[in-house]
Amino acid sequence: MLMGQYEHTIDAKGRVIIPAKFRGELGDRFVLTKGLDNCLFVYSLEEWKNIEAKLKTLPLTKKDARAFTRFFLAGAVECEIDKQGRILIPANLREHAKIEKDVIFIGVSTRVEIWSKEVWEEYSNNTDVSFEEIAEHLDELNI
């Protein structure tokens, strides 16, 4: 399970070190794509196959399903970790996540999220609902 929070700095070429704690579970190659809430999602190749299978079941007749699939897949790239443990985050994905310098990596069960430090701090400090309020509603999700 992917969990924890780590901070790194992106270099001038758009490369960033993937935290060692995540490398073992993600493998040397994985998929990076546009995420929700102005972050990036990182999936192992195995988990990406599961995501693709779910996306294939979405009805083409539904406008929202088509739009989400386009958004999600158009931004997806396969990444390979270099010898220094880094990946290159393409410019379009850095722009989507507003990443300029400092980044936060967050393990979220089956994926890693990559956030601009500033965006993460704003998101986590200004969430409309408290952690306790979210926890109260988890029973509705059978958790």
Curated annotation (Swiss-Prot):
Cross-referenced CDD domains: MraZ_C, MraZ_N
Any Gene Ontology CC annotation: nucleoid
GO molecular function, a single term: DNA-binding transcription factor activity
Domain SpoVT-AbrB: 5-47, 76-119
Pfam families from the UniProt entry: MraZ
GO BP field: negative regulation of DNA-templated transcription initiation
InterPro entries: MraZ (IPR003444), MraZ_C (IPR035644), MraZ_dom (IPR020603), MraZ_N (IPR035642), MraZ_sf (IPR038619), SpoVT-AbrB_dom (IPR007159), SpoVT-AbrB_sf (IPR037914)
Main location group: cytoplasm
The keyword Acyltransferase is annotated on this UniProt entry: no
Subunit structure: Forms oligomers.
HAMAP family recorded: MraZ
UniProt-listed NCBIfam families: division/cell wall cluster transcriptional repressor MraZ
Name of the featured protein: Transcriptional regulator MraZ
